[in-house]
C-alpha cells in the first residue's frame, strides 16, 4: 500500500519510491530521506509556524539561491539546497489534511565531527564566514514572522513571567538563576544590520573532505547581527563537556571566520563575543525552560523532562 510520503512525492517526481526513512534530530519539522532513482529530502513543515508565511520564506530562499550563483560565491565548492517544484510549479504542497510539505534534492556530505578537533572547528568558522559573504548579495531579505524572535531575550522573558498556571511545577534553581541574571543578560548588546542564517549551529552545516560546503535549514535567514550566528555556532562546537567555553576552540573558529569572510570581524571583538555567547545560552535555556513549564512542545523531546535538563545545563553553567 502506498504510504503518505509516497503520495506526496508523486506531486514532485514521477519515479517509483524504493525507500522512505525518517530522519530524527530536528526540533520543528518531520524530515524523511526518500530514495527514488536518486535521493531526496521530504519535509512535513510545522503548520503552527509556517501557515501564512510561506511567501516570505520562499522570497528569502530565492534571494539566497541567487546569491549562491554569483561569481564570488563560486570560487570554492558551495551548495545551496535545491527546492523542487510540484507539477503545478509550487515549492510547497498542502495535502487534504492541511499539512504543508516541501521536497529538495539530497546533498551528499558529512556532518561536523568533534573527533577531528580544531581542524573542523576552523572549517566551521570558515564556512560561516563564507555564508555571511554570500548573504551580503541578498536583496530585500524579509524577517519571517515565525522566527522573528529567535534571539529576542525580552520576548522570551515575557513568555516566561506570564506563565502562571496553578498546577505548574517550577524548578526553584532555574527561577532563581533567571531572576538573578536577566538584567545582566539584557545589557549585552551587539551591532546589527546584517543578513544572517539565524540558526547557524554546526548541526546545520555539511562538510566534504573536511571543508564546509553547505548550510541547511535556511528558513531562518533574516536581518540580524553576525554575532547571533557566531554565538550559535560557537555554542554548538566550542563548549566542553562541563558546559564551559573552550577558548582555544573559539580562537580557531574565529580564525576560520576571518579567512572565510575577508576580515569582517576583528579578533579584538572576542571578549564581546564571549559575553554574547553566554547571552545566547541564557536565551536558549530560557526557551527550553518555558517550553517545559508550558507544555507547548515547540522543542521535541526524546524523553520526558529533556527540555528541563537542557535548560539546567544552559542556565546553570557559566562561561
Which sequence ranges carry the predicted segments?
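ATP-dependent phospho-/nucleotidyl transfer catalytic cores
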Residues: 21-25, 44, 51-55, 110-122, ...
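ATP/Mg2+ or Mg2+-diphosphate-binding catalytic cores
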Residues: 283-319
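ATP-binding glycine-rich phosphate-binding loop
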Residues: 17-35
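Hydrophobic alpha-helical bundle architecture
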Residues: 257-277
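Conserved ATP-binding subdomain of kinase catalytic cores across diverse folds
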Residues: 27-30, 47-150, 226
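Active-site Asp-x-Gly
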Residues: 208-255, 262, 298-309
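Juxta-kinase regulatory segment immediately upstream of eukaryotic protein kinase catalytic domains
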Residues: 1-21
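Active-site ExK catalytic segment of metal-dependent nucleases
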Residues: 41-48, 218-219
Amino acid at each position: 500500500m502506498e504510504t503518505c510520503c509516497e503520495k506526496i512525492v508523486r506531486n514532485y517526481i514521477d519515479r517509483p519510491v524504493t525507500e522512505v526513512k525518517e530522519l530524527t534530530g530536528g526540533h520543528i519539522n518531520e524530515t524523511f530521506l526518500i530514495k527514488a532513482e536518486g535521493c531526496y529530502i521530504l519535509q512535513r513543515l510545522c503548520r503552527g509556524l509556517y501557515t501564512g508565511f510561506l511567501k516570505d520564506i520562499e522570497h528569502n530562499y530565492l534571494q539566497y539561491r541567487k546569491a549562491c550563483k554569483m561569481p564570488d560565491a563560486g570560487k570554492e565548492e558551495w551548495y545551496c539546497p535545491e527546492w523542487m517544484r510540484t507539477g503545478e510549479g509550487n515549492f510547497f504542497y498542502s495535502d487534504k489534511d492541511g499539512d504543508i510539505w516541501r521536497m529538495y534534492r539530497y546533498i551528499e556530505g558529512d556532518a561536523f565531527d568533534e573527533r577531528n578537533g580544531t581542524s573542523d572547528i576552523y572549517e566551521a568558522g570558515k564556512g560561516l564566514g563564507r555564508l555571511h559573504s554570500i548573504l551580503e548579495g541578498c536583496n530585500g531579505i524579509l524577517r519571517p514572522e515565525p522566527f522573528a524572535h529567535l534571539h529576542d531575550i525580552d520576548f522570551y522573558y515575557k513568555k516566561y513571567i506570564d506563565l502562571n498556571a496553578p498546577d505548574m511545577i517550577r524548578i526553584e534553581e532555574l527561577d532563581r538563576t533567571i531572576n538573578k541574571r536577566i538584567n545582566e543578560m539584557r545589557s549585552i548588546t551587539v551591532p546589527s544590520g546584517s543578513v544572517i542564517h539565524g540558526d547557524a549551529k554546526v548541526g546545520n552545516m555539511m562538510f566534504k573532505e573536511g571543508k564546509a560546503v553547505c548550510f541547511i535549514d535556511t528558513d531562518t535567514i533574516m536581518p540580524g547581527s553576525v554575532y547571533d550566528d557566531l554565538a550559535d555556532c560557537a555554542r554548538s562546537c566550542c563548549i566542553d563537556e562541563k558546559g564551559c567555553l573552550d577558548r582555544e576552540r573559539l580562537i580557531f573558529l574565529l580564525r576560520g571566520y576571518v579567512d572565510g569572510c575577508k576580515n569582517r570581524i576583528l579578533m579584538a571583538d572576542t571578549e564581546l563575543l564571549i559575553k554574547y555567547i553566554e547571552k545566547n545560552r541564557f536565551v536558549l535555556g530560557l526557551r527550553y525552560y518555558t517550553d517545559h513549564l508550558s507544555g507547548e512542545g515547540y522543542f521535541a523531546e526524546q524523553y520526558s523532562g529533556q527540555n528541563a535538563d537542557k535548560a539546567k545545563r544552559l542556565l546553570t553553567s557559566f562561561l
